[in-house]
């Protein structure tokens, strides 16, 4: 009996590890094959960061890991109240501005609109408010946006997206503040909030490979001897650029559908020189702000102190007028 219990204990962690690996492999397989087999819009997938960096989306340097795949820097902003009371619902507004007239390449090379995505790191204890706590007016601002935690049991780090950028250049998060009186791990004070937000597809896949939303360069120095156009079974067009080096060796660089070739046959190129334009019109941005979890008793005492100061000033004014009257009476006497 004891041996069976020991075996069960040993196999539980093994089963959990195998299950996690299978889920990760299935997820990555789905997204990579869907890019090839099922052409889709230019999307921003923040949960790729979740798969690659499962513990936290923020590096020790302070950089959000989405920047590893989204190489272009673009603005992003998060707005929150300066201070909030415990156990109250407030809104955090994430702004991801861009020119909606812009279009970029999808996985099949076609031009499509941009999607947006974001990761919002709230202080410990802060989380998305339950639906019954959200006011009706705030529900309208939030819309049909779905928020998910970055990690199971970590409700203060939130993922959202991909969402259509034309509709969601501003994303409203309904946030519930914690109550230190019921949670002893939470304390009143000032806390940091971190945002990472992107519009459009990344330039690098989590595997390190370039997406077709990137600049492709020559892998060797030499002369372009041939540019061959190929079409796969799905109708996606790509180019094979043959470069003959000075030693006579031929190197072939593959250019996927999307980027436009800026070279021609017979042209001399150097290693690292661009063979295509840069099709990327999106980018990633970070923003940091602070919020104060205010003690309501401190607010009450502050109001009482202000009232006391005002009362003291009033008494001084009355006393001054009284002294002036006495002095005037003595002068008349």
Swiss-Prot record:
Heme binds at residues 45, 66, 69-70. One of its GO terms (biological process) is photosynthesis. Residues 1-37 form the signal peptide. InterPro entries: Cyt-f_TM, Cyt_f, Cyt_f_lg_dom, Cyt_f_lg_dom_sf, Rudment_hybrid_motif. Binds 1 heme group covalently. The chain crosses the membrane at residues 299-319. The keyword Iron applies. GO terms for cellular component: plasma membrane-derived thylakoid membrane. GO terms for molecular function: electron transfer activity; heme binding; iron ion binding. SUPFAM superfamilies: Cytochrome f subunit of the cytochrome b6f complex, transmembrane anchor, Cytochrome f, large domain, Rudiment single hybrid motif. Residues 38-298 are cytoplasmic. Pfam families: Apocytochr_F_C, Apocytochr_F_N. Its cofactor is heme. Gene3D superfamilies: 2.40.50.100, Cytochrome f large domain, Single helix bin. Residues 320-333 are lumenal, thylakoid. Its main location: membrane. It is a single-pass membrane protein. It is found in: Cellular thylakoid membrane. Keywords: Electron transport, Heme, Iron, Membrane, Metal-binding, Photosynthesis, Signal, Thylakoid, Transmembrane, Transmembrane helix, Transport. Belongs to the cytochrome f family. Component of the cytochrome b6-f complex, which mediates electron transfer between photosystem II (PSII) and photosystem I (PSI), cyclic electron flow around PSI, and state transitions. The 4 large subunits of the cytochrome b6-f complex are cytochrome b6, subunit IV (17 kDa polypeptide, PetD), cytochrome f and the Rieske protein, while the 4 small subunits are PetG, PetL, PetM and PetN. The complex functions as a dimer. This is Cytochrome f. The gene is petA.
């Amino acid at each position: 009996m004891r041996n069976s219990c020991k075996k069960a204990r040993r196999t539980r962690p093994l089963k959990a590890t195998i299950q996690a690996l299978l889920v990760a492999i299935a997820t990555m397989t789905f997204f990579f094959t869907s890019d090839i087999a099922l052409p889709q819009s230019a999307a921003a997938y923040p949960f790729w960061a979740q798969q690659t960096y499962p513990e936290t989306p923020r590096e020790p340097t302070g950089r959000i890991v989405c920047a590893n795949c989204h190489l272009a820097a673009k603005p992003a902003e998060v707005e929150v109240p300066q201070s909030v009371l415990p156990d109250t619902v407030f809104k955090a507004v994430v702004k991801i501005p861009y020119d909606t007239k812009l279009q970029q390449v999808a996985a099949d090379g076609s031009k499509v609109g941009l999607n947006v995505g974001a990761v919002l790191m709230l202080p410990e204890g802060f989380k998305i408010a339950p639906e019954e706590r959200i006011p009706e007016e705030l529900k309208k601002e939030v819309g049909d946006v779905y928020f998910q935690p970055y990690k199971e049991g970590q409700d203060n780090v939130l993922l959202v997206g991909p969402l259509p950028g034309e509709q969601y250049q501003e994303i409203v998060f309904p946030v519930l503040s914690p109550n230190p009186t019921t949670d002893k791990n939470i304390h009143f004070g000032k806390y940091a909030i971190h945002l990472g937000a992107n519009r459009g597809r990344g330039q690098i896949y989590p595997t390190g490979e370039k997406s077709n939303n990137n600049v492709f360069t020559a892998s060797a120095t030499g002369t372009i001897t041939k540019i061959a156009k190929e079409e796969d079974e799905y109708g996606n067009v790509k180019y094979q650029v043959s470069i003959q080096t000075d030693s006579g060796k031929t190197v072939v660089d593959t250019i996927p559908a999307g980027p436009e070739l800026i070279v021609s046959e017979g042209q001399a190129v150097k290693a690292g020189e661009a063979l295509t334009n840069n099709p990327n019109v999106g980018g990633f941005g970070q923003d940091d702000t602070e919020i104060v979890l205010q003690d309501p008793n401190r607010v009450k005492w502050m109001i009482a102190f202000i009232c006391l100061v005002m009362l003291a000033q009033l008494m001084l004014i009355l006393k001054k007028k009284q002294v002036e009257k006495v002095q005037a009476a003595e002068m008349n006497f």
